[in-house]
Amino acid sequence: MHLLVVSQYFWPEDFRVNDLVSGLENRGHKVTVLTGLPNYPSGLLDIDFIKNPSKYRKYNNVDIIRVPIILRGSNKIKLLLNYVSFALSASTIGVYKLRKLNFDLIFVFEPSPITVGLPAILLRKIKKVPVIFWALDLWPDTLNAIGIVKSKFILNLIGGLVSFIYNRCDLILGQSKSFLPHIQKYSNHSNIKYFPGWAESVFSDIKDENSLPHNKKSFDIIFTGNIGDAQDFPSVLNAIELLKADSNIHWTIVGNGRLLSWLENEIVIRNLIGSVTLAGRHPINKMPYFFNKAD
């Protein structure tokens, strides 16, 4: 089968879709990926991509079709423009670049935003092939939960967009069983299935590495991942402040994101330098070592 994977994020960005695509290719499928420009999580264009963009036209034997987008930047307006720009660019430039290709199936990877489904359902109509939509984030629920959108009117509009997309997919996959009733609320068909994520193979054999930040005398709390709005770092910092009197507790934050500069400033302002280590971004194969240090 020739499969088209539509994802706003793809290698060199670290997302599970990379493993999914490799797995599909290893099973003998021909895979093409429609994606944007790598700028997650920093909001800046990937340095290696800038130096050698031709290197990122292929992922093993997988063809990568990239479309121009507005970069995520460091504020909510730029993030919104980033979301909209991919949907528009993939629905126009992306569709044009794919005009001579035929597919048997379209697979959508949606960690956020929901708008990644728009170019997919347009291509569904043009190519006359089914769409599978893997929902890893729940819109509009997530927007409301993290306070990005509070207006009921706007949330209802977004809910209408979610229904529009869901109802034009042939199969919807939810990464958690608790997702399924939420998805059903915005869909008029019952073809909704549970499809969980998985751990990368590097986590099967965790080894020690003494070069990583670690204080054997402390109780180590470690966070790894994106440093953004959804992670609610104001609450994390409040917790660190409450516990900073206990010198045996140490926090390590591994990752990068739009709010990294803000986090660095807040740590200084709140006098938390002795309680927190910002370890920066590390490749996935280093993550098991950090997890091994966590209490």
Q: What do these predicted regions represent?
A:
Residues 37, 178, 195-198, 281:
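Carbohydrate-associated surface elements
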Residues 170, 275, 291-295:
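Acidic donor-binding loop of glycosyltransferase active sites
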Residues 184, 193-194, 198-217, 232:
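Acidic anion/phosphate-binding donor-loop and adjacent secondary structure
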Residues 14, 80-95, 105-127, 132-136, ...:
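An aromatic- and histidine-rich active-site surface loop
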Residues 213-231, 236-241, 252:
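Conserved donor-binding/catalytic core segment of Leloir-type glycosyltransferases
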Residues 1-57, 243:
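N-terminal subdomain of nucleotide-sugar transferases
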Residues 218, 252, 261-288:
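Nucleotide-activated donor-binding/catalytic signature segment of Leloir-type glycosyltransferases, i.e.
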Residues 115, 122-126, 152-172:
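Membrane-proximal helix-turn-helix segments that form the acceptor-binding/catalytic region
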